[in-house]
């Protein structure tokens, strides 16, 4: 009985940590996306000073939370977001509006995807369980 109680306690702690990390991940990704969404309003006017500033702000927020995301995301996902930020900064510096818009859309889509993966939804748990059974079979 003692081992069952200890096991359930450990399981409860792990579940709580999983929920906390999931909520923090979604919060941090929204903080990173906010300046990028704000930069969209300056695209039509072509105000690259504001665009560069907002892009740098988003990149700083990503860098600030990089240690946290390194513990949750795969290296491929981290590299993809970092490369997208580098492309976005380069296009903003060169004032290449079409390329900036394409890179901006790609980065926003990637961040939204990462946010959706970590949101607490029943099918995120079910997909994980199904994948575990498929990999064993």
Please identify what each model-predicted range represents.
Residues 6-20:
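Hydrophobic membrane-insertion alpha-helices, especially the h-region
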Residues 1-5:
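Positively charged n-region of N-terminal signal peptides that target proteins for export
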Residues 76-124:
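Structured, soluble extracytoplasmic/luminal domains of envelope-associated proteins
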Residues 39, 43-50, 92-96:
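Short helix-adjacent coil turns
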Residues 16-17, 39, 65, 88:
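Alpha-helical transmembrane segments of multipass membrane proteins
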Residues 119-137:
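Cytosol-/stroma-facing membrane-proximal "stalk/adaptor" domains immediately downstream
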Residues 49-91:
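Extracytoplasmic/periplasmic/luminal assembly and interaction segments
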Residues 25-42:
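Alpha-helical transmembrane signal-anchor/signal-peptide segments
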